[in-house]
Regions:
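Structural cue for short, hydrophobic secondary-structure segments
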Residues: 39-40, 108
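Short, solvent-exposed loop/turn segments at secondary-structure boundaries
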Residues: 48-53, 116-120
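N-terminal secretory targeting modules
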Residues: 1-39, 45-52, 62-72, 91, ...
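Short helix-loop-beta-strand segments that form the rim/entrance of peptidase-like active sites
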Residues: 70-80
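Cell-envelope and extracellular/periplasmic
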Residues: 4-16, 78-89, 100-119
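A secondary-structure boundary/capping signal
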Residues: 40-41, 77
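Short, surface-exposed alpha-helical segments at coil->helix boundaries
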Residues: 55-59
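Active-site metal-binding loops of divalent metal-dependent hydrolases
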Residues: 42-43, 81
Length: 121
């Protein structure tokens, strides 16, 4: 079975946004405040193929925050669930991520969202 992963930029959602909230979060960390990092996604976020749980990308990003901002009280939420799509992520984001009021959130559903009309919308 061959899968086509050629995605044109005009078919996707590209939002460069602004860096205001990220800068605010980093300033909070620089000042030694509490920073909650949260990660929502599928098995890549969960770390299912990592050699151990501390080698998954989410934990490595969390460790980066702790290293760059040693005065901050950085906490870690990994809401990665293998085999799930962004549609399921939307259904669980409130309970698994937002209720903790995170300062920094990364979302990844790269593998499980299919290249079909539903996920292109």
């Amino acid at each position: 079975m061959s899968m086509d992963y050629n995605i044109k930029a005009e078919d996707g959602v590209i939002n460069k946004g602004n860096l205001y909230r990220l800068k605010k979060c980093m300033k909070k960390a620089l000042n030694g405040g509490p920073v909650i990092t949260a990660f929502l996604g599928g098995s890549i976020t969960q770390g299912s193929l990592a050699s151990d749980s501390e080698k998954c990308y989410a934990y490595l990003v969390y460790k980066w925050w702790k290293k760059k901002f040693p005065a901050a009280d950085v906490s870690f939420i990994n809401a990665g669930v293998g085999g799930t799509t962004s549609q399921y992520g939307v259904a669980r984001v409130e309970d698994h991520v937002l209720r903790y009021r995170p300062d920094f959130v990364l979302t990844e559903f790269a593998v499980n969202d299919k290249n079909d009309e539903f996920f292109k919308k």
